[in-house]
A protein has these predicted regions:
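Conserved beta-strand hairpin/beta-sheet module of binuclear metal-dependent hydrolase folds
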Residues: 2-54, 58-60, 164-174
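Metallo-beta-lactamase
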Residues: 60-72, 99-152, 206
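Residue-level marker for buried hydrophobic side chains located in beta-strands
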Residues: 34, 65, 89, 171-173, ...
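Core dinuclear metal-dependent hydrolase active-site scaffold
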Residues: 27-28, 138-167
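Divalent-metal (often Zn2+) His-rich catalytic cores of metallo-beta-lactamase-fold enzymes
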Residues: 203-254
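Active-site metal-binding loops of divalent metal-dependent hydrolases
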Residues: 38-40, 69, 94-95, 157-158, ...
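C-terminal regulatory/interaction regions
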Residues: 245-311
Length: 311
């Protein structure tokens, strides 16, 4: 399913697990069309068919940009690169080597996801190294002469996370940096997985995006939303709230996951059960608790003390 959501921007529902409105890719059209996010490998056949339905032939796609290399965002990149042989693949420098040789990434994912890896996500096929371009802060990717996407380094969710600024439409493609905002759910929900989550970096990244005064945020999970600055502020408050609850639990010797469930899962009580299950499949309390717990532990070790108020 595709939808033009702004001038020259097409939202493509990549349907992770066959679910609608859970994972999105975005095609920015022009003389050199650019695909942002591929979704998982399990979504690749659908994505390829949708691109072809939009008139994108194998020789047309100029670039693929990945906000980060988690499998729900990048798992299909090897398949897309194979079908669209002229497309360059843009990624954070720390992610480039994993696209060329994904063996370590797949091994790690196997330990995290277990049987869900193959049933829900699929794997990640290698991308030819000569087609991978490492993106730095401020680099641009041309769409049409005089029009481009600009890369912002936005670590926090993952250390190798980047976002993309499309000034003509005021759209910031934010990946998972701001969290998850599914249409059927409505509320913003954090995404703080291990091993890289870092509160200070995450909030700095949201400020960096806010400095561009975007009118819209385009989430990988899911869709393009107005009132971008308000959502960015909400995202900062949300991350700080979750981290404060987790820190208090750690100081009190309580299970962080239990404390977070008690504090925030009641916010989901009025949701349709299917919508709630989709949200928690994408960004469950268990994974978020693991990420925050790891961050708190690393911060304590760095500071040489048990705790300090969350930023």
């Amino acid at each position: 399913m595709t939808e033009f959501i702004a001038d020259n921007i097409v939202e493509i529902d990549t349907q992770l697990g066959g679910w609608e409105h859970i994972t999105a890719g975005y095609l920015v059209t022009g003389e050199s069309p650019v695909l942002i996010e591929t979704g998982s490998q399990s979504s690749a056949p659908l994505l390829i068919a949708e691109l072809q339905s939009l008139g994108i032939s194998p020789s047309d796609l100029a670039a693929v940009v990945l906000t980060h290399i988690h499998l729900d965002h990048a798992g299909g990149v090897g398949d897309i690169a194979r079908v669209f042989p002229k497309a360059k693949v843009y990624v954070h420098p720390s992610g480039a080597r994993h696209l060329a040789d994904p063996s370590r990434l797949i091994n790690s994912a196997s330990m995290v996801y277990g049987p869900l890896l193959d049933s829900l996500y699929g794997r990640l096929d290698p991308t030819p190294a000569d087609r991978i371009i490492a993106v730095e802060e401020g680099d641009t990717i041309e769409i049409t002469k005089g029009l481009h996407l600009e890369a912002l380094m936005t670590p926090g969710h993952a250390k190798h996370h980047l976002s993309l600024w499309h000034e003509p439409t005021g759209t910031m493609f934010c990946g998972d940096a701001v969290g998850v905002k599914l249409p059927e759910v409505g509320i913003l929900w954090p995404a703080t997985p291990p091993p890289d989550f870092d509160l200070a970096l995450a909030t700095q990244s949201l400020e960096a995006m806010k400095s561009r005064s975007p009118s819209h945020l385009a989430f990988a999970h899911y869709g393009r939303f107005a009132n971008a600055v308000d959502i960015l502020d909400e995202g900062k408050d949300l991350l700080r709230d979750w981290c404060r609850v987790a820190e208090a639990a750690m100081v009190d010797g309580r299970e962080i996951e239990t404390a977070l469930e008690e504090a925030f899962v009641p916010d989901l009580k009025d949701l349709d059960p299917t919508a709630r299950d989709r949200l928690l499949t994408l960004s469950g309390v268990h994974a978020n608790a693991m990420g925050i717990s790891r961050w708190l532990t690393k911060r304590s070790e760095h500071n040489g003390q048990n705790s300090r108020p969350a930023d």
